[in-house]
């Protein structure tokens, strides 16, 4: 398996070689390389450029998409239970912190990508509903002389308990969306919520549509992370915010060793016992190790056009929240 650096080098050399050959053709020069050998070299470089990783395995870009889909199709029904078991429930705190950092205002239009089971969407709806109710109470206290009829009229004018806020959950996996919809019905979430089947690399939304874009524990599964970031930038309104909660690199050597031991020796076993799927959770562990560091991912977000990009490491760097703005 080629190292990441060597793949990048081959990709760079391939681009340089192609430019050189085009230059020779424009000048009317002929290559001294035998035709068959030259063609084989270029084809080999193109093949390498189209390869990516699926955990620790090297696969074609096209193959990765199908493999990732199968992983989440397989684990969808046990996804939330496994999140609780693997993280000992700490993932709930991380997601609460994401909402605290988001601090959505009334009327916020949120796009939650790779949010199939609805964890972020439900937290958002709870948050904005609570904020709106507090606003209503403040307004009523300021109008204590109103009659009961006038108070009832005020409430009728405020039928939208979310204050105009909306969330769209977008996921590429039908099974994950199915689980999310079932949870929404069971927990009574109906208003201000929409479910859309879509690809993070090619979002089915117009430009400048959303105030906030979130993606939690999803972007490392995308084949072209740079393309997903560019799509996030495209669909956000000017002034909109990008927020990503994702596994990252542990910054404490002792905790890192313990984390590796737990990840590789315990998590796949839990996956087999609870979800009946060792391989999917082996991929999960490996995909975390292949994801860029906090600083590297920060650079990628900036390259996509975002400004004021920052990140906060949580639980010694096991996860990080990255934030950026579209200006």
From Swiss-Prot:
Assigned EC number: 2.1.1.201
What GO cellular-component annotations does this UniProt entry give? extrinsic component of mitochondrial inner membrane; mitochondrial inner membrane; mitochondrial matrix; mitochondrion; protein-containing complex; ubiquinone biosynthesis complex
* Tissues in which the protein is found: Widely expressed, with highest levels in liver, lung, placenta and skeletal muscle.
UniProt keywords (A-Z) are: Membrane, Methyltransferase, Mitochondrion, Mitochondrion inner membrane, Primary mitochondrial disease, S-adenosyl-L-methionine, Transferase, Transit peptide, Ubiquinone biosynthesis
GO MF terms on file? Answer: 2-methoxy-6-polyprenyl-1,4-benzoquinol methyltransferase activity
Q: Topology with regard to the membrane?
A: Peripheral membrane protein
- Localization in the cell: Mitochondrion inner membrane
Quote the pathway field: Cofactor biosynthesis; ubiquinone biosynthesis
Pfam families per UniProt? Ubie_methyltran (PF01209)
Q: Which family does it belong to?
A: Belongs to the class I-like SAM-binding methyltransferase superfamily. MenG/UbiE family.
Q: Outline the subunit composition.
A: Component of a multi-subunit COQ enzyme complex, composed of at least COQ3, COQ4, COQ5, COQ6, COQ7 and COQ9. Interacts with PYURF; the interaction is direct, stabilizes COQ5 protein and associates PYURF with COQ enzyme complex.
Disease (UniProt): Coenzyme Q10 deficiency, primary, 9: A form of coenzyme Q10 deficiency, an autosomal recessive disorder with variable manifestations consistent with 5 major phenotypes. The phenotypes include an encephalomyopathic form with seizures and ataxia; a multisystem infantile form with encephalopathy, cardiomyopathy and renal failure; a predominantly cerebellar form with ataxia and cerebellar atrophy; Leigh syndrome with growth retardation; and an isolated myopathic form. COQ10D9 patients show cerebellar ataxia with cerebellar atrophy.
The protein in question is named 2-methoxy-6-polyprenyl-1,4-benzoquinol methylase, mitochondrial
User: Which organism's genome codes for this protein?
Assistant: Homo sapiens
What gene is this protein a product of?
COQ5
């Amino acid at each position: 398996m080629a190292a990441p650096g060597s793949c990048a080098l081959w990709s760079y050399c391939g681009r340089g070689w192609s430019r050189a050959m085009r230059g020779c053709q424009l000048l009317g020069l002929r290559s001294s390389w035998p035709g068959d050998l030259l063609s084989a070299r270029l084809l080999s470089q193109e093949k390498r450029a189209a390869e990516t990783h699926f955990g620790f395995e090297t696969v074609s870009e096209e193959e990765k998409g199908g493999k990732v889909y199968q992983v989440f199709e397989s684990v969808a029904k046990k996804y939330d239970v496994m999140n609780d078991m693997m993280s000992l429930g700490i993932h709930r705190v991380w997601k609460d912190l994401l909402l605290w950092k988001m601090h959505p205002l009334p009327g916020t239009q949120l796009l939650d990508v790779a949010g199939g089971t609805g964890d972020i969407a439900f937290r958002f709806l709870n948050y904005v509903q609570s904020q709106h109710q507090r606003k209503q109470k403040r307004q009523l206290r300021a109008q204590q002389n109103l009659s009961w009829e006038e108070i009832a009229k005020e409430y009728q004018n405020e039928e939208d308990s979310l204050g105009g806020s909306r969330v769209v959950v977008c996921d590429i996996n039908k099974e994950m969306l199915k689980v999310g919809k079932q949870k929404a019905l069971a927990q009574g979430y109906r208003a201000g919520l929409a479910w859309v089947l879509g690809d993070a690399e090619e979002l089915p939304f117009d430009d400048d549509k959303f105030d906030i874009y979130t993606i939690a524990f999803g972007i490392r599964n995308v084949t072209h992370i740079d393309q997903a970031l560019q799509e996030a930038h495209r669909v956000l309104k000017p002034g909109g915010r990008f927020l990503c909660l994702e596994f990252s690199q542990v910054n404490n050597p002792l905790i890192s060793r313990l984390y590796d031991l737990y990840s590789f020796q315990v998590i796949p076993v839990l996956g087999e016992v609870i979800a009946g799927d060792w391989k999917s959770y082996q991929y999960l562990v490996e995909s975390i190790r292949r994801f860029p560091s906090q600083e590297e991912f920060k650079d990628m977000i900036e390259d996509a056009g975002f400004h004021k990009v920052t990140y906060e490491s949580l639980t010694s760097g096991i996860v990080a929240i990255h934030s950026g703005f579209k200006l």
